[in-house]
Curated annotation (Swiss-Prot):
Taxon lineage: Bacteria, Bacillati, Bacillota, Bacilli, Bacillales
Entry GO CC: plasma membrane
InterPro entries xref list: LytR/CpsA/Psr_CW_biosynth, LytR_CpsA_psr
Protein's name in the database: Regulatory protein MsrR
Task performed by this protein: Involved in SarA attenuation. Affects resistance to oxacillin and teicoplanin, as well as the synthesis of virulence factors.
Gene: msrR
Alphabetical UniProt keywords: Cell membrane, Membrane, Signal-anchor, Transcription, Transcription regulation, Transmembrane, Transmembrane helix
NCBIfam families named among the record's database cross-references: lytR_cpsA_psr
Gene3D superfamilies associated with the record: LCP protein (3.40.630.190)
Family under the similarity heading: Belongs to the LytR/CpsA/Psr (LCP) family.
Membrane topology: Single-pass type II membrane protein
Location(s) in or outside the cell: Cell membrane
Extracellular compartment spans: 53-327
Amino acid sequence: MDKETNDNEYRRQSEHRTSAPKRKKKKKIRKLPIILLIVVILLIALVVYIVHSYNSGVEYAKKHAKDVKVHQFNGPVKNDGKISILVLGADKAQGGQSRTDSIMVVQYDFINKKMKMMSVMRDIYADIPGYGKHKINSAYALGGPELLRKTLDKNLGINPEYYAVVDFTGFEKMIDELMPEGVPINVEKDMSKNIGVSLKKGNHRLNGKELLGYARFRHDPEGDFGRVRRQQQVMQTLKKEMVNFRTVVKLPKVAGILRGYVNTNIPDSGIFQTGLSFGIRGEKDVKSLTVPIKNSYEDVNTNTDGSALQINKNTNKQAIKDFLDED
C-alpha cells in the first residue's frame, strides 16, 4: 500500500512539473498577439505623425514661400551605399539674377554612418563647358545646377548624384523651427558688414538670421577662406545639436517647410532616410575639406573676371578622391 501511494505521489509531481512549462508557454503565446497589436498601433501612430508633420510644413511653405521648379540634373546614380549632393546657397543679385553664395558637396555613407563635406571656393578659375574660362560660380548663373555639375566634373572630378539649392529664407526658417532656443556659436570677432545683422564677439546662441549672417561674413583678412571655414563650423555645430530627441521629432515638419525653400531633385524618401540616419545614427563629427587645398593654387588677375584662383587640377582631383574614398 505504501508503495502504491508513493507511485501515485510521484506521478502527480511528474505531471505538475510537465504541465507547468506548458501553462507558461500558453501564456506567452496568448501575449504575443497583444504585443504585435501594440507594435502595429505604434507604427501607425508614427506614420500618422510623420505625414501630419510633413503636411503641416508643406502648408506653411505654401503660405510663405514661392513655388519652385526643379532643374534638369543628370547626376549619375551609383548605388554604392552613398548619397552625394551638390548644395548651393542661393541669393538674388541686383536685377534679380541668381547667384551662388556658397558651393558645397555633401556625401553621406549609409553603411558607415559617416558624412563628409567639401567646400568649393567660388573664385576658382575654371573651364566652363561651352563658355570658356570663368570663375566657377559663374556656371550656375549661365546654366543652373546642371552646368555647374559638368564644370565640377571637368575641373575637379566631382560628379554628385543630386542637387539642392537652399534659399536663404529657407535656411533661417529651418534653424528657427529645429532650434528655437538658438544655435551655440563662438563668434570670433565683431561682425556686421554686409550680413544684415550685428554680431558681437563671444559665445552666443544665434537664431536663423544671425547664424546665416555669421556663415556669410567675409570682410576680414581671410576673405572667402574664412567664410568657408565658418560655414564648416556651422555644419559641425548643427550636426551635434541635431542628435537629440526634441530635434529629431521635428524633422518631418522641417522637411515639409524646406520643400518651399529648397529647390532639389532629391525625392521625399531620400530626404527622410538620409535625415533620420544622419540625425540619429550618424557620427557627430563631419569630416570636411576645402578646395583648393593648401599650396595648390595661386592668386591671378583675369581680363574677364578680375581676381581669381588658378588651381593645380591634378593635385586637387587626387586630394578629393582620397578624401571621398577614405573610410
